[in-house]
Amino acid sequence: LILCYIPTNLCNLKCEYCLVSQVDGWHERKDIEFKYPIEHMIKAFSKERLGGECFINLTAQGETLLYKDIVALTKGLLEEGHSVEIITNATVTKRLDEILSFPEELLTNLFFKCSYHYEQIKDKKIEGIYWSNVKKIKESPCSFTIELMPYDKIASSIPDLCERCKKNAGAVCHATVGRDDATNGKNLLTKMSKDEYVNTWSVLKSDMFKLKMDLFGKKRKEFCYAGAWSLLVDLSSGEASQCYGRMNTQNIFKNLNKPIQFRPVGYSCMQPFCFNGHAHIAWGMIPEYNSPSYYNVRN
């Protein structure tokens, strides 16, 4: 599992629960400097260097499809033989169409996580664009999922958002869990009690939501293989860490002849809980934890 972080803030939506849109210049194209060209990055992620085929997640701080080199990067990773996941709000049609024009043998290894920003798009022109693009993906050889960010303001709209999902995508969306990163304990991003929050959003019957709430606020003390079986890589520099909650420990772009160090977190996790467990525990980073598979939390 390779988690690629693209540190670009540019986004075309302004969501009140998102930290990116709270900073000045969030909607302006101010591309940061990427130290290495795409061709170099692809070589850094070669199957030989990584030890085989990997599942590679591409996530920008803003909208991933607005990263200027996302098409070339995605194609290069697929051609290398990896499976690729793109996190997107599914509204950047031009880039999406370019990607969907790839050969079928590449698209079968491509997965889109389409974030459903219900309040920001409902009954607006952009909602038509969103569902049109979701349908394009559905009709392609790619895989996809719809994921909602649940928050208090839209709790009363659950029946409506479920109906829109069923009508346009064929199934009710999954749900993630919002957290308040301004708090040391990464508290739930809600004014509800935990029980009320769970009862409210469990109606979606999302395995993603259930797993994240099962993990929420519970310190993991088992041996964790993140770092041995996964990496988090900053694509602007090549700096890499074992997971989201660790400091960078190596640069995997600087010297392509230098072996990548795969060292597990083990018993030394310092986080209050595994806040992105769907991206680690669902992939088996803690083998003794009886987790649903990544397939289940995304299907």
Go through the PLM ranges and name each one.
Residues 1-21, 55-59, 230, 234, ...:
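N-terminal pre-triad scaffold of radical SAM enzymes
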Residues 2, 22-35, 52-66, 80-95, ...:
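Core AdoMet radical
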Residues 20-32, 278-288:
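Iron-sulfur (Fe-S) cluster-binding segments and ferredoxin-like electron-carrier domains
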Residues 32-44, 70-72, 96-99, 124-135, ...:
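Well-ordered, non-membrane alpha-helical segments in soluble/globular domains
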Residues 45-49, 78, 99-109, 131-139, ...:
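Acidic (Asp/Glu)-rich catalytic clusters
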Residues 109-111, 122-212:
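Conserved C-terminal portion of the radical SAM core fold
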Residues 181-299:
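Accessory C-terminal segments flanking Radical SAM cores
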